[in-house]
């Protein structure tokens, strides 16, 4: 265990549920986090902002929150701003890091300006001439492509497009989820990886090998045939360097304390960062518990470690 007296945390709210497209995942994460904290002796209580006003946190004497909300107002800076207003310490990034981290478009703009490698991309706005934009994008980026709403997590509405004819429909589908759509060149040849970040813990990279085309919502939260390779199979020196770049990708967005940075390798071993996640899933399929377990850190110890980061100035 961490050696922290659980009484130091005071009364803790585990925020989960919410109203985003990721509500069901958040409910699962939150229940497990709640149990993990209670197992460690923390005075933790469930709190679903979809069912109760946030003012109840202050009224009921909560001093700290473990944010297990995913997507929407739980991850885009809004809940963080409210918690700041009420003077409640919380896990994860603050307003700026959360807002940028959930916005794939602005994430990529920051990375381009700070030297973090990211796949070439184009943006499409809801209301654009999709057929014309599709033709232009294929000419610029080639195929295959990934189409993503700019501000959804858990691979909600992410589509892999292999033919030019399929692109307009994919754009239309993504535009129902967000007014900005990202179209990204698919990086092929080296596989998908994630770097889990939790304070000063040195967690291993995970190589993700989905049974399907890519690591989509089903592969993340439903399927049991996705492979998670720990160790990831890369040389130690390369893994260390990739973890350093991942931490930089996280830091330049203003993200703090804990999260994930996802990236692809091409056939030559070059990394291209896709996104960060400032409120990672904590289900039994999720990546941070897997990375922690690989270095001997159990679920309860991990959530206490994450919560302990709120004790820092």
From Swiss-Prot:
Keywords: ATP-binding, Cell shape, Cell wall biogenesis/degradation, Cytoplasm, Ligase, Magnesium, Manganese, Metal-binding, Nucleotide-binding, Peptidoglycan synthesis. SUPFAM superfamilies: Glutathione synthetase ATP-binding domain-like, PreATP-grasp domain. It is found in: Cytoplasm. InterPro entries: ATP-grasp, ATP_grasp_subdomain_1, D-Ala_lig_Van_CS, D_ala_D_ala, Dala_Dala_lig_C, Dala_Dala_lig_N, PreATP-grasp_dom_sf. Mg(2+) 2 binds at residues 275, 277. ATP binds at residues 138-193. GO terms for biological process: cell wall organization; peptidoglycan biosynthetic process; regulation of cell shape. Binds 2 magnesium or manganese ions per subunit. Its main location: cytoplasm. Its cofactor is Mg(2+); Mn(2+). Mg(2+) 1 binds at residues 262, 275. Its EC number is 6.3.2.4. It holds the Pfam family Dala_Dala_lig_N. Pathway: Cell wall biogenesis; peptidoglycan biosynthesis. Residues 108-308 form the ATP-grasp domain. It catalyses: 2 D-alanine + ATP = D-alanyl-D-alanine + ADP + phosphate + H(+). GO terms for molecular function: ATP binding; D-alanine-D-alanine ligase activity; metal ion binding. Transmembrane segments: none annotated. One of its GO terms (cellular component) is cytosol. PANTHER family: D-ALANINE--D-ALANINE LIGASE, D-ALANINE--D-ALANINE LIGASE B. Cell wall formation. Belongs to the D-alanine--D-alanine ligase family. This is D-alanine--D-alanine ligase.
